[in-house]
Swiss-Prot record:
Similarity comment: Belongs to the CLASP family.
Gene Ontology MF term list: microtubule binding
Lineage start: Eukaryota, Fungi, Dikarya, Ascomycota, Saccharomycotina
GO BP term, pick one: mitotic spindle assembly
Protein name: Protein STU1
Pfam families in UniProt: CLASP_N (PF12348)
UniProt keyword ATP-binding present: no
Positions of the UniProt region annotated as Disordered: 870-913, 1113-1134
Organism field: Eremothecium gossypii (strain ATCC 10895 / CBS 109.51 / FGSC 9923 / NRRL Y-1056)
Keyword Nucleotide-binding: no
SUPFAM superfamilies: ARM repeat
Top-level taxon: Eukaryota
Subunit structure as annotated in this protein's UniProt entry: Interacts with microtubules.
C-alpha cells in the first residue's frame, strides 16, 4: 500500500509565499484529503496549521475560501478515520474557526461548515454541545446568531434521523433562558426573535407560555406575550403536534376513513404467543417449505395459505412486542418477505387477501422496524394496484396506504410511488394521489428538497384525462399548499384558466386555508371591449341602478383580491412548469426558494424586504439550504448585503469571474448563474474579460446557456457567430436574432462561419462540430430563409450576393436538412438568376448537377445545359453570323499591324492557359470548346456558307473542307476528324498532309477575284498560328488537359516517342512497334474499324493471358490478323509474378479521381446499360454453356458475371446464417422475377407485412436466378426491397425487430456481392440507426436481437470498410456522447474497437487523443463490461502509439486522466494481447 503523503501546510504562513503558491498548496492538500486517508501523526499538525492560517487576516478571498473548505474536508476525514481525536479544546478551536468566520460569505460556506461540524457532533455529541453552549454564551452579535442557527441545525438533524427533537431542545433551553435574561447591552433584538422563532417550531402555545414564565427581562418578554401568530395563518388547525403545520394523527385518520373499511378493520381473531424465539424460528422455517416451489400449484396453494395465516397469528402475538428485532432479522434470513410477495401475487383471491392483511398488520405492529423489508413488500402491492379484480386492487391500495402511514421515509419507496402516477391504468394513478398526500402530511420537510418532483407529480395528476384522478389530486394540491404555498401557486399558475378555477373551488374546508381567488375580468368588460371606450346603451336598454351597484361591488371585491394576488406574485418564480421539467441547474436552484408566504416566520419588517430578497438570485443559488431561519437572520446586518439590496453587487463580480475561470464544469455553470443575476441587476461588466471565458464554455457546455440566451443584455457579451451556434443548439426561435441584429451582419456572419465547421482532427473543436454541425447548418439555413423571404434585398454593386451564393454552393453535400438547403437555393436563384447561374458554372461537378436538377424541378424554364459550359450562351448561340465574319476578316489585318490578335470574339472565349486548376473538371463537360481551332474553323466555314448559298456552285464545291467534332464515343472524350468532302484525296495523317489541306483551299480560290478569298486566308492563318501556340496540342486542345485525358486503346500500337512512359524499361517494346513511331488516332478510326462492338477474341497483348503466363501451352495460337505464332515470344515476360508487378505499376500510374456516391452510381448504371455484342469467343461460350446451356438466356454480359451467395459469406455458427437457412427451407420455387414484381406491387398497394419481405429475401438466398438478378440490378429491385424493409421497421406497432436486423444483414451482403453498390450511405445509415434504436430497448445481452445487431455491425465493417467505416466511426462516437443505456454503450464500445482495428493507420494522433479522453471516463465505471471494453480500446490506442514510436512522455500525457494503476492495467492488457 502506498504511504500517505505529507503536506507542509506551515508554509502557508510564510511571508514570502505568494497567493498562487498558497492556492497550489491548499488545492493539493484538499485533493489528498478528499480521496485518501491522512497520516495519523500529521493530523494535529494539519489542524494547527489551518487554524492558525484561517485565524489571521488573509487578503486573497479565494485563498481564504479554499483554506476553509480544506479544513472542513479534513474534519470529515478525521471523523471517519479517528473520531477520538476530537476533544474539548480542539472542538472549541474548530467551531470558532469554521463557524465564526466573518470575512467569508456565510451563505456560501454555511453548508460545508454545517456538514463538517455535524460530523464532530456525531462523534462527540455531549462535548460538542457543551463547547457550543459556552461559545454562544461568551459571544455577541453575529457570532451568537450563528451559534443559535447552528443549534437549530442540530435539532433538525435529530428530527431527520427519526428521533425526538425535543431531547436536543430541552438541553439548550436553559442556555436560551440565560441569554434572554441578560441585561442591556446583552442579547440583541435579532437574537431574541431568533430564539422565539426556534421555539415556535417545536413548542405549542402552552409550552411557550411556560417558557415565558422563566424570562424576567422585559425587553425579551414582550416577544412571548402575544403568541397568536405561533402557527401560520394559512394553516390554523387544532393541531396538537408542535413540529409542523399538520396534526399528523388527525390527518392520517382522515386518510384512513377514505380506505375500504373491510380492509382496515379486518383482523385475525387468534394470536400465538411464544416463550422462546427458537420456537418462532422453527415455525418460520416450516412455513417456508411450501414456498420453495417456483410456481403455485393445486397442491401447495393451501399450504401457502395456512402458512400466511400462521404468520398473521405470530405477528398479532407477543413476538412483535418481545422479539421485534429478532423477528425482522429472521424474516430477512429466511426470505419471509419473498414468501409474502409470492402469496400476494397469487391468482386465488383468499390467499392474496390474507397476504395483504399480513403486510397491514406487520405495519401496525412493527412500524419503523419494518424498513429493511419495505422494498420487497411494496413491489407486489404495486402490481396488485393494477389488478382487474376490484377487490384485489382495493385491498392492495388500503395495505399500501397503511404501510406508508407507518413506515419511515424511504427514497426508493417514494420513487416507486412516483412511477405509479405514470401507470397506464387509471386506478394506480388515482391511488398515487393519495400516496402523495400521505407523504406531504408526514414528511413535508423532506419533500422541500424534492419540490421539483412533487410539482411534476401534481401537474401530471391535475391534467390527467380521467376525472377521478384529477379530483383526488386537487385535494392533494391543497395539502401541499399548507407547508409550501409558493410551490403550490407555481403549479396553479401553470394550469389553464378554466382548470385553475375548478381547482380553486375545491379547497377542503378542514384545512382552513386562507386563499383568495383571483378575480378574473368579466367577459362583458374584456380587454378587447375596453379598447373601444365606454359602452354606450340605447335609451330603452340602459342598465338599471341595481345592476350598477352589483357591478361596483364586484369590482371592489375583485380589486381587493387583485391587491392580494399582486403581493403574492412578487414571490412567484419566473420559470414555468415546463422549464422546471427540464431540471436545469438554474431552475433547480430557483425552485428552492423559502416558503415565506406560508411559514408565517417573517416579521413585518422582513416582509417589507421580501421582494428584494427574492430578486437576489445569488443567495438562492449559492446556498440551497432549506432552513428558512438562515434566510431571515444570517448576515442581515452586514454591509455587503445592504449594498446588494440597493442593487450594487460588489462580491458577485469576483465570484462570477472566479467560477468562470475554474477548471470544473459545475463551477463554470454556477458562474453563468452569477452572470444572470448581474445582468438582471444591470451591473457593469468587462466584456473583454468575459468574452474568451464565455466562448470556451459555449464549446464545452453549450446547453448551459439556454436561460441566458433569453436575456437581450447577454447577447453583446459573446461574438455573433458563437451566439448563433448557441441559439441553434438550444433550439431557440430565429426571430430574436432577426429583430436584434442587422440583416447584413447576420448574413456575413453566417457565410463566414461555414468555413469553421470543418476543423482539423487535431483541433479541439473537431468533436464539437462532429456533434452539432448538422444542427448549426440547419439553423443557419433557417435564418437565411427567414431573412431572404422577407423584405431584404441585396444592394446593387455589392459582393454580398456573390459571397452568399458561393458559400451556399460550396456547402452542398454535407450533413444537413436537404429540404431547407434546396429551399434556400431556390430563393437565391430567384433573387438574381443570371448571376446565380454564372456562379453555378464554377461549382464542382457533383454539386453543380445536384443543384441544377433541383432548380429544374422548381423552375421549368431553367435550362440544364446553361451550366454545362463556361461560354456565355447568349454570345455563342445568338450572335450574328455576319458579325462573326467581320471579326474574322479583320482579325488578320489587326494581327499584321500589331503583331497580336485583337479579335474580340476570340479574346472573350480564350481559356486561361496559365491556370489549370479546373482542367480536371473540364474533362467531364469540355468547357473550353471555343478554344479549339476546329471550332474557329467551323464558325468561319459556317459564315462563308451563309454568304455563298446563291453564288457559283463550282466555287462552293471546291470549298469542301469541313471540320467535324465527333463526340459519340460515350466516355466523354472528344475525337476530332478532318475530312475532305467532295475531293478525291485521302485524309491527312501527318504534317505534310496538313500543308496539303491548306494548299487545296488556296488552289481552289487562286486566280479568282472572289472577295471571300480573304476569309479563307484568315482561316489558313488561324490554322498555322494555332500550330505555333506553345500551349495547344495538335488537336486544338490544351496540352495539360490532353495529357490528363489521354486515351490509349489496348488494340492500338504504342507510340514510341509520346507513350514511352506507358511501359517500363522497354519490356513491352518490340521491333515492329519501334519502326512505327508515327501512328495517330486515325489508325483506330478507319472505315473497317467502325464496328462499335468489342471483339473479345482479340485479346489485348498487355492482358493476353494466353501469351503471358500459365494459360500459355506452347501451341500455336491464332491472333486477330490470322497469323500464327509458334513457341515463346522473346519479349514476353517469363513469369506471372513479373507481369503482375508491371500491371500493378501501371495501375499506380493511372490517375484515380475521387468520385462521390452519386457520381459513382451514375457511372455504374451507365456501364451496366451498355449492350455488348458477342462474337464467336470460345471462352465466353463455354462459360455460358456451363451455366445456362444456351447463350440466349443472358440479358447482358455483366449479369452473367454476377453471383449472389449470402450464406457462403456468413460463418456457419452465426445466428443470421441460421435464420436465413430457415428462409431457404421455405417453398419459394414460384418466386421468379415476375412473381416478385407482382408481390412488390401488391405490397405497395396494401399493408406491408414482414412475411412478404421474408419470402423475397428467401428467394434471393436459396436460388438467385438470372431474371431475379436482373431485377435486383437493372430494375432497382434491391433498392425497392430495402425501402420496403425500412418502411416496415419504422411502422407503428411493429414488433419483429429481430427479423428486420437479419434481413438488413442479408441485403447488405447481397449488395456487396454485386458488381456495383446499389445502396447509398444514407441507406446504410438507416440500418445502423435502426440497430441502435433496438439496442436502447434491451436490458440484457442474452438476447437474439443483440447478437443479430453484432453480426450486422460485422457485416458493415467487413464489406463496407472503405466506403462507410469513417462515417460509422463518427456515428459511434456521436452516439457514445449521448447514450445512457447499458447495453447500447457496450455495443458502441465494441464498435469502436472493431473500427479501430481496421483504421488504426488512418487515424491521426489528435483523433486518437480525443478518443482516449472520451474512453477514460468509462474506466472507473461500475459496470464491468464498460470497464473491460474501455481498457481494451485504450490498449489498442496505446499499441498504435507504440507502433508509431511515440515518446513515453507523450503517451503518458495522452492517458493523463488515468491513475497510475489504471495506466499499468492498460499496458498489461496491450502486452498480453500483443504476445
Amino acid at each position: 500500500m502506498e504511504e500517505p503523503r505529507v503536506h507542509n501546510l506551515e508554509k502557508l504562513m510564510d511571508e514570502g509565499v505568494a497567493g498562487i503558491e498558497q492556492l497550489q498548496i491548499l488545492t493539493a492538500f484538499k485533493t489528498h484529503v478528499k480521496k485518501e486517508l491522512v497520516r495519523d501523526d500529521s493530523i494535529e499538525r494539519y489542524f494547527d496549521a489551518l487554524v492558525r492560517f484561517l485565524g489571521q487576516p488573509v487578503e486573497d478571498r479565494k485563498v481564504q475560501q479554499l483554506g476553509h473548505s480544506s479544513l472542513c474536508y479534513l474534519i470529515k476525514r478525521v471523523a471517519m478515520q479517528q473520531p477520538g481525536r476530537f476533544q474539548g479544546a480542539r472542538i472549541r478551536d474548530l467551531v470558532r474557526v469554521v463557524l465564526l468566520q466573518e470575512q467569508l460569505q456565510e451563505r456560501k460556506v454555511w453548508g460545508s461548515a454545517v456538514k463538517s461540524l455535524e460530523a464532530i457532533y456525531l462523534c462527540k455529541p455531549q462535548a460538542f454541545e457543551a463547547e457550543l453552549a459556552s461559545i454562544c454564551a461568551a459571544t455577541r452579535g453575529s457570532d451568537r446568531t450563528k451559534c443559535l442557527l447552528f443549534m437549530d441545525e442540530l435539532i433538525q438533524l435529530q428530527q431527520m434521523n427519526n428521533r425526538n427533537p425535543m431531547e436536543v431542545v430541552n438541553r439548550f433551553v436553559d442556555l436560551w433562558v440565560d441569554v434572554l435574561n441578560e441585561s442591556d447591552p446583552g442579547c440583541s433584538k435579532r437574537d431574541i426573535e431568533l430564539i422565539h422563532d426556534i421555539l415556535k417550531k417545536y413548542f405549542n402555545e402552552a409550552m411557550l407560555q411556560q417558557f415565558a414564565e422563566r424570562v424576567v427581562n422585559t425587553r425579551s418578554l414582550k416577544h412571548f406575550m402575544h403568541t397568536e401568530h405561533a402557527a401560520p395563518s394559512s394553516a390554523q388547525t387544532t393541531s396538537s403536534m408542535p413540529s409542523g403545520p399538520f396534526d399528523v394523527d388527525e390527518e392520517l385518520t382522515r386518510v384512513m376513513e377514505e380506505l375500504p373499511p373491510n380492509v382496515v378493520n379486518s383482523n385475525i381473531g387468534e394470536a400465538r404467543d411464544y416463550l422462546s424465539f427458537e420456537h418462532v424460528v422453527k415455525d418460520l422455517e416450516h412455513i417456508t417449505v411450501a414456498f420453495q416451489a417456483i410456481k403455485e400449484t393445486e397442491h401447495n396453494w393451501k399450504q401457502r395459505q395456512e402458512g400466511i395465516i400462521t404468520l398473521r397469528k405470530i405477528v398479532n402475538g407477543n413476538v412483535s412486542r418481545q422479539f421485534p428485532d429478532e423477528f425482522i432479522q429472521a424474516c430477512r434470513d429466511l426470505n419471509i418477505a419473498d414468501c409474502i410477495s409470492k402469496a400476494a401475487l397469487s391468482l386465488r383471491t383468499t390467499l392474496s387477501s390474507h397476504s395483504c392483511h399480513l403486510i397491514k398488520e406487520m405495519a401496525f405492529k412493527l412500524g419503523p422496524l419494518l424498513e429493511p423489508l419495505l422494498d420487497v413488500l411494496f413491489v407486489p402491492l404495486r402490481s396488485l394496484l393494477s389488478a382487474t379484480k376490484k377487490i384485489s386492487s382495493q385491498t392492495a391500495f388500503a395495505t399500501a396506504a397503511i404501510l406508508l402511514c407507518t413506515a419511515p421515509y424511504h427514497n426508493r419507496l417514494f420513487q416507486q410511488c412516483i412511477a405509479l402516477s405514470r401507470d397506464k391504468n387509471v386506478s394506480p394513478r388515482t391511488f398515487a394521489a393519495v400516496f402523495l398526500r400521505i407523504y406531504i402530511i408526514r414528511f413535508h420537510r423532506r419533500l422541500e428538497h424534492s419540490s421539483v418532483l412533487v410539482e411534476e407529480w401534481l401537474h401530471k395528476g391535475l391534467t390527467d384525462p380521467q376525472t377521478q384522478v384529477r379530483e383526488a389530486m386537487r385535494v392533494t394540491l391543497w395539502y401541499w399548499y399548507v407547508p409550501n404555498a409558493q410551490s403550490a401557486k407555481k403549479v396553479l399558475d401553470s394550469m389553464p384558466h378554466q382548470m385553475k378555477r375548478i381547482i380553486e373551488g375545491s379547497i377542503p374546508t378542514y384545512l382552513n386555508i386562507e386563499y383568495h381567488v383571483t378575480a378574473s375580468v368579466s367577459s362583458n368588460e374584456s380587454s378587447r371591449r375596453s379598447s373601444f371606450g365606454v359602452r354606450r346603451y340605447p335609451s330603452y336598454a340602459a342598465p338599471t341602478q341595481s345592476s350598477n351597484l352589483q357591478k361596483l361591488a364586484a369590482n371592489s371585491l375583485g380589486g381587493s383580491a387583485n391587491v392580494r394576488s399582486l403581493s403574492e406574485n412578487t414571490n412567484r418564480h419566473l420559470t414555468t412548469y415546463t422549464s422546471l421539467a427540464k431540471k436545469s441547474l438554474a431552475t433547480r436552484h430557483e425552485s428552492l426558494s423559502p416558503r415565506v408566504a406560508s411559514s408565517g416566520l417573517i416579521s413585518s419588517a422582513g416582509a417589507a424586504n421580501l421582494s428584494s430578497e427574492n430578486l437576489e438570485l445569488t443567495e438562492e443559488l449559492t446556498s440551497n439550504h432549506s432552513n428558512t431561519l438562515l434566510k431571515k437572520y444570517l448576515n442581515t446586518n452586514e454591509p455587503a448585503v445592504i449594498r446588494k439590496s440597493e442593487g450594487e453587487p460588489t462580491g458577485d463580480l469576483e465570484s462570477m469571474y472566479s467560477h468562470l475561470s475554474s477548471t470544473t464544469l459545475q463551477e463554470k455553470q454556477q458562474g453563468l448563474l452569477f452572470l444572470k443575476n448581474l445582468l438582471l441587476l444591470k451591473a457593469p461588466l468587462d466584456i473583454a474579460k468575459l468574452n474568451p471565458l464565455l466562448v470556451q464554455l459555449s464549446i464545452q457546455s453549450p446547453k448551459s446557456f439556454k436561460d441566458l440566451l433569453t436575456l437581450a443584455s447577454f447577447h453583446p457579451l459573446i461574438p455573433l457567430a458563437n451566439l448563433i451556434e448557441l441559439f441553434a443548439i438550444n433550439d431557440l426561435p430565429t426571430n430574436v436574432l432577426l429583430d436584434e441584429f442587422s440583416s447584413t451582419d447576420l448574413l456575413e456572419t453566417v457565410i463566414h462561419s461555414f468555413q469553421t465547421f470543418f476543423p482539423d482532427h487535431h483541433d479541439q473543436l473537431f468533436l464539437y462540430y462532429v456533434k452539432y454541425r448538422s444542427v448549426i447548418f440547419n439553423y443557419c439555413f433557417g435564418i437565411m430563409i427567414d431573412l431572404l423571404s422577407g423584405d431584404f434585398a441585396f444592394s446593387e454593386g455589392s459582393t454580398l450576393f456573390r459571397e452568399v451564393c458561393t458559400r451556399i454552393i460550396e456547402a452542398c453535400g454535407n450533413d444537413f436538412n436537404m429540404e431547407k438547403y434546396y429551399t434556400l437555393i431556390s430563393i437565391l436563384y430567384r433573387a438574381d438568376k443570371s448571376q446565380f447561374v454564372e456562379l453555378l458554372r464554377d461549382a464542382p461537378v457533383s454539386s453543380k448537377f445536384k443543384i441544377a436538377n433541383e432548380l429544374q424541378r422548381c423552375d421549368s424554364t431553367f435550362n440544364l445545359h446553361s451550366i454545362m459550359s463556361r461560354e456565355s450562351t447568349a454570345e455563342s448561340h445568338h450572335s450574328d453570323p455576319n458579325q462573326q465574319y467581320k471579326d474574322g476578316a479583320h482579325g488578320g489585318d489587326a494581327r499584321d499591324a500589331n503583331g497580336t490578335s485583337n479579335s474580340s470574339s476570340d479574346s472573350d472565349n480564350e481559356p486561361d492557359l496559365e491556370s489549370t486548376k479546373h482542367l480536371l473538371e473540364m474533362t467531364m463537360v469540355n468547357p473550353i470548346g471555343l478554344g479549339c481551332v476546329e471550332n474557329v474553323l467551323q464558325s468561319h466555314i459556317h459564315a462563308y456558307k451563309q454568304d455563298q448559298q446563291h453564288q457559283d456552285p463550282i466555287a462552293e464545291k471546291s470549298l469542301s473542307t469541313v471540320a467535324e467534332v465527333n463526340d459519340e464515343d460515350g466516355d466523354g472524350s472528344t475525337t476530332t476528324q478532318m475530312k475532305l468532302m467532295g475531293a478525291n484525296t485521302t485524309e491527312p495523317s501527318n504534317e505534310s498532309d496538313k500543308d496539303k489541306t491548306s494548299d487545296i483551299v488556296a488552289e481552289s480560290m487562286r486566280g479568282t477575284d472572289d472577295p471571300n478569298y480573304a476569309k479563307l486566308c484568315a482561316i489558313d492563318s488561324a490554322l498555322i498560328d494555332s500550330e505555333d501556340e506553345p500551349e495547344l496540342n495538335n488537336f486544338g486542345g490544351l496540352k495539360g488537359l490532353t495529357e490528363m485525358t489521354k486515351v490509349v486503346s489496348i488494340y492500338e500500337k504504342l507510340d514510341g516517342d509520346e507513350d514511352v512512359e506507358m511501359v517500363d524499361d522497354e519490356k513491352f517494346k518490340d521491333p515492329v512497334e519501334q519502326e512505327n513511331q508515327e501512328t495517330g488516332l486515325d489508325e483506330i478510326f478507319r472505315d473497317e474499324k467502325h464496328d462499335q462492338s468489342v471483339k473479345f477474341n482479340d485479346i489485348p497483348r498487355i492482358i493476353d493471358v494466353n501469351k503471358s503466363w500459365d494459360r500459355y501451352d506452347g501451341e500455336s495460337i491464332e491472333d486477330t490478323s490470322g497469323n500464327t505464332s509458334h513457341g515463346t515470344d522473346e519479349n514476353r515476360p517469363a513469369s506471372f509474378g513479373t507481369v503482375s508487378e508491371l500491371v500493378r505499376k501501371e495501375m499506380e500510374k493511372s490517375p484515380t479521381l475521387p468520385l462521390n456516391e452519386e457520381d459513382s452510381k451514375l457511372l455504374s448504371d451507365g456501364i451496366n446499360e451498355i449492350e455488348l455484342k458477342h462474337k464467336d469467343d470460345p471462352f465466353v461460350r463455354d462459360s455460358e454453356d456451363c451455366e445456362n446451356g444456351t447463350p440466349q438466356d443472358r440479358s447482358n454480359f455483366l449479369s452473367c458475371k454476377q453471383h449472389i451467395d449470402i450464406l457462403g459469406a456468413l460463418p456457419d455458427n452465426s445466428l443470421t446464417a441460421f435464420e436465413l437457412g430457415l428462409l431457404e427451407i421455405l417453398d419459394v420455387s414460384d418466386m421468379d422475377a415476375n412473381r416478385i414484381l407482382e408481390t412488390v406491387n401488391t405490397i405497395q398497394n396494401s399493408r406491408l407485412r414482414s412475411a412478404d419481405v421474408s419470402r423475397i429475401v428467401g428467394a434471393i438466398v436459396s436460388h438467385c436466378t438470372d431474371p431475379l438478378l436482373h431485377w435486383l440490378t437493372d430494375s432497382n429491385g434491391l433498392q425497392r426491397l430495402w425501402s420496403m424493409l425500412t418502411a416496415l421497421s419504422t411502422a407503428d406497432g411493429f414488433s419483429d425487430s429481430y427479423k428486420c436486423v437479419v434481413l438488413y444483414t442479408a441485403l447488405l451482403i447481397a449488395n456487396s456481392q454485386l458488381s456495383s453498390s446499389h445502396l447509398s450511405t444514407d441507406e446504410l445509415s438507416d440500418a445502423w440507426a435502426f440497430a441502435l434504436r433496438e439496442l436502447s430497448k434491451l436490458s440484457s445481452y442474452n438476447n437474439e436481437t443483440y447478437i443479430a445487431c453484432c453480426e450486422l455491425r460485422e457485416t458493415l465493417i467487413e464489406h463496407y470498410s472503405s466506403s462507410y467505416l469513417p462515417q460509422l466511426l463518427e456515428s459511434a462516437i456521436k452516439e457514445l456522447n449521448v447514450a445512457e443505456d447499458r447495453v447500447r454503450i457496450t455495443f458502441l464500445l465494441q464498435t469502436l474497437s472493431d473500427a479501430l482495428d481496421h483504421m488504426n493507420t488512418l487515424l491521426s494522433l489528435e483523433v486518437l487523443g480525443s478518443m482516449s479522453s472520451l474512453l477514460q471516463q468509462f474506466v472507473t465505471n461500475d459496470f464491468t463490461e464498460w470497464r473491460y471494453h474501455s481498457i481494451k480500446l485504450l490498449a489498442q490506442i496505446y499499441g498504435i502509439l507504440v507502433a508509431r514510436n511515440s515518446p513515453a512522455s507523450y503517451i503518458r500525457s495522452m492517458f493523463s486522466i488515468l491513475r497510475q494503476p489504471e495506466f499499468d492495467l492498460v499496458k498489461s492488457y496491450y502486452t498480453m494481447d500483443h504476445n
